[in-house]
Amino acid sequence: MTEPTAKVCHYTDVPAATFGDDAPGVSIRWVIDETKDGAPTYALRVIEVAPGGHTPDHTHPFEHENFVIEGKGRVQIDGEWHDVGVGDVVFVPPSAQHTYVNAGDVPFKFLCGIPVSRLMP
């Protein structure tokens, strides 16, 4: 693991990556992580879902903490849909089935905190 160092930057200084074919219109920026920044506990990501885009319906053994910073979306957690917008927070428990969908005509953007790999089950 990289030694932890302070970091201050604009999120757009971090390159965006795509999620892949199963997540049309979705990009991710790992703005704080264990590999580049030495974050010992949590990684922070900015996820952007373009109009008409969505993440795959998926599950994993770790939680998500989300904070919506732009646009409107719909989040499905274990079969229940929730409408979300700027300022809303979302907690996805470990092993919950979930997906994110852009519900508007501008990007749906949110922060997503997850544990670093060494703390994942």
Locate predicted features.
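A short, N-terminal "cap"/entry segment at the start of jelly-roll beta-barrel domains
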Residues: 1-41, 121
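A generic structural signal for short beta-strands and their flanking turns/coil linkers
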Residues: 27, 40-45, 64, 71, ...
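Conserved short histidine dyad/triad with adjacent acidic residue
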Residues: 28-33, 45-60, 94
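A generic "binding-loop/recognition-motif" signal
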Residues: 61, 80, 96-97, 106
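Short beta-strand His + acidic residue motifs that chelate non-heme Fe in jelly-roll/DSBH
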Residues: 55-57, 75-76, 92, 98-104
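Short, conserved beta-strand element in jelly-roll/cupin
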Residues: 46-50, 59-75, 113
